[in-house]
Design a protein with these regions (language model features):
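N-terminal capping segment at the start of a domain
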Residues: 5-32, 48, 52-57, 61, ...
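Second-shell loop/turn segments in exported
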Residues: 1-5, 23-32, 61, 104-106, ...
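Noncatalytic luminal/extracellular "stalk/propeptide" segments of secretory-pathway proteins
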Residues: 14, 21-119
Length: 417
């Protein structure tokens, strides 16, 4: 058993604060802020005593395509100037950038408008029919020459920001607050002015990796977390990314520090990786899983802790138990009085699972309506709850100890990649 010291709470919290700080500007992949975060993490691994495991010391290059605003977004309908992220937001996965000026045209389910009535117009869809297909709707609008598409998208406190982009996008596509969409829909012909300086670029980024050698060089446990976030908006709106995922990075870093202090070699290698490009489409983990620095036997990914005052539930990255690692992790989680939520998809664990590597994707599953929303300005140190971080750390430590003390678990491994 590894004698894990009680985590250094002050150091752990300072790591989270630094990663969330204005100096890092939201850690958007490929930006100065993300490079500062990577430098901090590599220096932390060096100081902890982990050996470099990247192509260039602690770094491995990753090309990340992503959608990013290069200037403030503006939308004016009639005399009303709308507020970005509160009244409207871009659908980055489907949207191009651009400047559009023109009359508003309302389209409802069952309307039969000619191409001439739509070409060059800015279309608002104020109600979504039950069989609404977003992708085909956007495709049809672009084919008909619609200048921009405004789609009612509920009444959130804040619209979620995304940076997942596509070079196939042809027109600006905007989420619009439902109450605004319904109000303007009754006044077709209103003048609309949209400025969306959204660009899809491929930027050079980096994964950060450190290594602790073990006795059995044929077995390697990967502990990982993504360090990128969404980046602050050009208009100054901050996206600190405290829960997503400064929390996970800080826990994995603290576990790595304490593993490096052990007095004896572990029975297996430990590889620690801080991954980039998660928010843009899992680019860092996809590259890592396709070309790891050594064969991987098992992977533990940590993404998001601190939504609520207590850690009531952890998602595990799978819809059902299917291999030895998920069964082991489920047992450890339950022993800490935490519910296991069998949910899959959306985090870096996906890239490793797709390669057939036993992998769990741990992350707090919010259980309360008032839980902090990630991908909004509310994901900040002021809204972070520390007890889930403490328990998440304890669960990861216990999981590592189970692997140290129970070699028979490793004998169940399906495959080394």
């Amino acid at each position: 058993m590894v004698q894990f010291a009680k985590r250094n709470v002050a150091r752990n919290y300072q790591d989270i604060l630094y990663l969330s700080s204005p100096d890092l500007s939201g850690r958007l992949s490929g930006t100065v802020g993300a490079r500062k975060a990577a430098a901090f993490l590599s220096e932390s691994l060096l100081q902890a005593g982990l050996s470099p495991a990247g192509e260039r010391e602690y770094f491995s290059s990753v090309n990340v395509p992503a959608a990013r605003l290069v200037g403030p977004a503006h939308l004016k309908i009639g005399d009303h100037v709308l507020q970005h992220r509160i009244d409207f937001s871009e659908m980055s996965h489907f949207s191009s950038g651009g400047i559009c000026k023109g009359p508003l045209v309302t389209v409802r389910d069952g309307d039969d408008l000619s191409p001439d009535q739509l070409a060059g117009k800015i279309v608002v869809i104020p109600e979504l029919p039950p069989d609404f297909d977003l992708g085909s709707t956007i495709q049809s609008a672009a084919d008909l020459g619609v200048a921009a598409l405004l789609i009612e998208s509920g009444e959130p406190n804040w619209f979620h920001k995304t940076v997942f982009g596509s070079t196939q996008s042809r027109i600006p596509v905007i989420r619009l607050r439902r109450s605004i969409a319904k109000a303007v829909a009754d006044h077709p012909g209103l003048k609309v002015h949209l400025e969306l300086p959204l660009e899809i670029n491929v930027l050079a980024c980096q994964n950060v990796m450190g290594f602790l050698p073990g006795i059995n060089q044929n077995r390697t446990l990967l502990l990982c977390a993504h360090y990128d976030h969404l980046g602050d908006d050009p208009d100054g709106l901050r996206f600190p990314g405290t829960i997503d995922n400064a929390s996970g990075v800080a826990v994995i870093l603290e576990v790595a520090r304490l593993l490096a202090k052990r007095e004896y070699a572990l029975p297996f290698n430990v590889l620690v990786a801080f991954l980039t490009g998660e928010e843009s489409g899992l680019w860092g983990s996809k590259q890592f899983a396709s070309n790891p620095p050594m064969p991987l036997t098992a992977v533990v990914n940590l993404d998001c802790l601190g939504f609520e005052t207590e850690l009531h539930a952890l998602r595990i990255g799978h819809q059902a138990s299917g291999d030895w690692l998920t069964e082991l992790a489920s047992s450890v989680i339950k022993n800490h009085g935490v519910d296991v939520r069998w949910l899959a998809g959306g985090d870096d664990s996906v890239a490793f699972i797709q390669k057939g590597i036993p992998t769990i994707g741990l992350g707090q599953k919010p259980t309360l309506p008032e839980s902090t929303s990630i991908h909004t300005v509310n994901d900040s140190p002021d809204n972070l709850h520390l007890k889930p971080i403490e328990k998440g750390y304890a669960i990861v430590c216990d999981l590592v100890n189970k692997l140290v003390d129970s070699p028979h678990f490793w004998d169940q491994e399906n495959k080394n990649i």
